Amino acid sequence: MSDPAADRDILKAKLNQETAKANWKELQPFFARGQTVYVAPELDLIEVALAFSEDQADILSLWRDKGQVDKVADAQAGQWFEADQALWTVVVMPWVLVQPVQVQ
């Protein structure tokens, strides 16, 4: 019998290892297919990826209602293209979750 908490920790570690930086221009094919999902900077990208993986509809709906998680809009994509925006990315098939890299 598997331990749900241990399974979640393993999935979280896997998602963390699969997180990478990419420039927006590299992600254009995914955007063109409607597969890029914006994650607001105040959210933890890995926690959002876990919510997608575990189909946590309630929390995803809450974030969507707050504008914190949503498909990347055309206007945002244009701004990121012009700025050659760097983004943190993680794939949760079929989605590519993206979060702007914060300059400190």
Question: What is the predicted role of each segment?
Answer:
Residues F31, R64, F81-E82:
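Alpha-helix boundary recognition
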Residues E47-Q76:
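Short, hydrophobic/π-rich interface segment
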